[in-house]
A protein has these predicted regions:
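Surface-exposed, charge/polar-rich loops and edge strands
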Residues: 93, 97, 125-126, 136, ...
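Long, well-ordered alpha-helical scaffolding segments within enzyme catalytic domains
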Residues: 24-34, 139-154
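Short glycine-enriched loops at secondary-structure junctions
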Residues: 46-50, 59-61, 108-116, 164
Length: 257
């Protein structure tokens, strides 16, 4: 089997789950045509974080509707993909000596199902989620992610789901171009991706004001590092869906491999 690529997806608003024809979801459908169907998916979502590492280990994860103030239809979306206790155990083994707790009760949050619904709408590929330990710095996450490299050889698609720029307080509801600071930060990250400049990607706070405004909290940025950490020197890289929504939410997505 050819080595699987790795993917980072900008998931944006949960409402994207309901609009199959918006340009971002069209981008997701286009990108998965570029590589083989995975045997399983490991998802690192911005919406599962805490002070420790956990992995979903149930055979039939339920849906988590972790939002409020949205139409009722959004809380009726189903993505009945199976879990994979086997993959969960493999992830725990690969990440040793870090302790990873198996969670058989945890379901899929919208950072996972809202994009998987458009990447693989049949919901027939096993999915496991790995949580983010926000007690640890970005370098720790990057180094941890490197341990997941063997998954690429085993047909597992590693997907980080977040947003490079994610500032909810600065959102503008009317159609508008991105803020200058959001554009600057997004462009700096894109340049670092093109140059394989992992130092800049990990130490994004060195971008100063643009970083402080674009990443007011780290959970939406960190999933990007789980993708870039698995990049090898010969891997191709494609940036897609490279737009800003509501002025301060970047939909920038990246395929590596």
């Amino acid at each position: 089997m050819n080595k699987m690529p790795v993917l980072f997806v900008g998931h944006g608003s949960p409402m994207n789950a309901l609009d199959a024809e918006n340009p971002f979801n069209q981008g997701f459908r286009r990108i998965v045509q570029k590589f083989a169907r995975p045997k399983a998916i490991l998802m690192i979502s911005a919406h599962w974080y805490g002070n420790r590492l956990q992995v979903t280990s149930g055979e039939r994860p339920e849906m988590i509707y972790d939002f409020y103030g949205f139409p009722a239809a959004l809380s009726q979306v189903q993505y009945p993909a199976p879990g994979s206790p086997e993959l969960a155990g493999l992830v725990r083994s690969l990440l040793q000596p870090e302790k990873v707790e198996m969670d058989p009760e945890r379901g899929f949050d919208h950072g996972a199902w809202a994009v998987l619904k458009h990447l693989y709408p049949e919901a027939d590929i096993p999915v496991v989620q790995l949580s983010l330990n926000l007690m640890q710095p970005a370098q720790w996450h990057f180094d941890l992610a490197k341990k997941l490299a063997p998954l690429r050889e085993q047909g597992v698609l590693v997907v980080g789901s977040g947003n490079v720029v994610h500032n909810l307080r600065a959102m503008r509801r009317e159609p508008a171009a991105g803020y200058e600071w959001a554009i600057d930060f997004r462009n700096a990250v894109n340049r670092a991706l093109a140059a394989q400049d992992n130092d800049t990607l990990v130490h994004y706070e060195r971008l100063r004001e643009a970083a402080a405004l674009s990443v007011p909290s780290p959970e939406h940025y960190l999933p990007l590092l789980y993708t870039t950490a698995l990049r090898e020197p010969q891997d191709d890289m494609e940036i897609f869906n490279d737009e800003l929504a509501f002025g301060s939410i970047s939909m920038t997505s990246v395929l590596i491999g």
